[in-house]
């Protein structure tokens, strides 16, 4: 599949990426429509949703649209509209990874074209708008937590430690990551919000779409050292082929930047990862420079490792303490308050198995959660799981159990 995409990219090199802009335009409109159908008048205060894209992925697709607009000569009305919609999607998705991709892609484009400065200006414009908008989602652009990715990174690294040479095989890493951020099987946020849970028949396969949220760790877990080396050489070859082309280089660099905190070029996908390999094929059609490819492969390895260097230098937070826990029987809701800074909290409800309640909370603020309405009566164990944001949060730092009767 990957080789076919690269070959298609070589064949489509004369055509370029102009058709992608029209597809992104339709994607943006469908995302705005889906969010309005899901949230109604609250759509502007909630993260953008799509039936088969996560908010993080939507933000990255917004970045791709902005980069296309800055480098390709679409008709002016469409060019302006696509750029505005791409910026709106990036802003409303509150995707810090998408913003990082735009910043790094723009910086890479500056090496060859002055238009790269416009991409960096777009980053500043998004941050300026986020700072002036009085909506909760805009605050995400100024937060430094990793939304629980630390736990996924650790789990993927532990799989790599157990299988350092060969990994566990393609699409099998997710079995070791299930339950870290979501349950055993999780569909797209839009579907889950609409009450479409993962069918029982799909639950054994839930690991197929659970990823490490870092491409280097994904490769190490799936394919071991040899596979990770192959991925880095492939990326280095793509970047070397794109050297000198502002659009191709910025697109590939944006994918690589996003690869620090997500898996944007995993395939098959809803035509996101496919764009990366098509771009790689177009880059290889321009030629191949082995020395430059090796150097850029090493730079890619360093870039994908930056999150771990960042975490390793963060100081340990002070131990937390429980201020109060109010979980009245039969009310269907609970509130827990902690003291202590630097923690992210997750709430899990366990009986025979465990299910996650809500998403994730800032440990410094009241943790308000609701119990599922279809919960069978009985006694349960409620687990408040606290992750720190330093040294990869190797395991949950603290687990506070409560016996509850929802």
Regions found by a protein language model. Give the residues of each.
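Membrane-interface micro-motifs in multi-pass membrane enzymes
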Residues: 49-64, 95-97, 212-215, 220-224, ...
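Interfacial juxtamembrane loops and adjacent helix segments
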Residues: 172-221
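Short, compositionally biased P/S/T/A/G/V-rich stretches that sit at domain boundaries
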Residues: 307-335, 406
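Transmembrane alpha-helices of multi-pass inner-membrane enzymes
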Residues: 248-295, 307
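A membrane-periplasm/extracellular boundary helix in multi-pass inner-membrane enzymes
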Residues: 36-39, 92-93, 110-146, 154-162, ...
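Alpha-helical transmembrane segments of multi-pass inner-membrane proteins
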Residues: 3-44, 50-112, 237, 241-243, ...
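Hydrophobic transmembrane alpha-helices and their immediate junctions
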Residues: 116, 222-253, 388
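Cytosolic-side transmembrane helix boundary signature
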Residues: 94-115, 279-298
């Amino acid at each position: 599949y990957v080789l076919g995409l690269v070959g298609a990219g070589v064949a489509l090199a004369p055509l370029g990426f102009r058709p992608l802009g029209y597809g992104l335009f339709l994607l943006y409109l469908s995302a705005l429509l889906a969010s309005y159908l899901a949230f109604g008048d609250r759509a502007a205060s909630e993260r953008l949703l799509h039936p088969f894209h996560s908010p993080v992925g939507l933000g990255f697709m917004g970045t791709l649209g902005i980069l296309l607009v800055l480098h390709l000569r679409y008709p002016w009305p469409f060019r302006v509209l696509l750029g505005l919609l791409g910026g709106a999607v990036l802003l409303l998705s509150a995707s810090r990874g998408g913003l990082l991709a735009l910043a790094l892609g723009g910086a890479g484009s500056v090496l060859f074209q002055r238009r790269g400065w416009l991409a960096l200006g777009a980053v500043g414009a998004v941050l300026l708008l986020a700072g002036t908008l009085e909506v909760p989602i805009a605050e995400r652009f100024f937060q430094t937590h990793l939304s629980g990715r630390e736990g996924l990174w650790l789990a993927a690294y532990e799989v790599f430690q157990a299988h350092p040479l060969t990994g566990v095989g393609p699409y099998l890493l997710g079995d070791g990551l299930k339950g870290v951020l979501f349950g055993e099987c999780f569909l797209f946020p839009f579907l889950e919000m609409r009450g479409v849970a993962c069918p029982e028949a799909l639950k054994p396969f839930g690991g197929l779409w659970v990823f490490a949220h870092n491409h280097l760790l994904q490769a190490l877990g799936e394919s071991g050292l040899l596979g990770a080396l192959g991925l880095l050489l492939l990326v280095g070859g793509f970047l070397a082929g794109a050297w000198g082309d502002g659009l191709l280089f910025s697109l590939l660099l944006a994918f690589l930047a996003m690869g620090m905190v997500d898996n944007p070029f995993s395939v098959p996908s809803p035509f996101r990862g496919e764009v990366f390999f098509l771009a790689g094929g177009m880059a290889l059609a321009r030629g191949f420079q082995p020395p430059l490819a090796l150097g850029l492969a090493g730079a890619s390895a360093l870039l994908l490792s930056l999150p771990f260097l960042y975490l390793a230098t963060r100081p340990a937070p002070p131990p937390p303490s429980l201020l109060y826990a109010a979980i009245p029987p039969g009310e269907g809701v609970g509130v827990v308050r902690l003291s202590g800074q630097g923690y992210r909290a997750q709430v899990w409800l366990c009986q025979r198995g465990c299910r996650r309640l809500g998403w994730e909370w800032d440990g410094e603020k009241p943790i308000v959660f609701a119990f599922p309405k279809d919960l069978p009566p009985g006694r349960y164990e409620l687990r408040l799981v606290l992750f720190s944001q330093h040294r990869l949060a190797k395991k949950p730092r603290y687990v506070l159990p409560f016996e509850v009767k929802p």
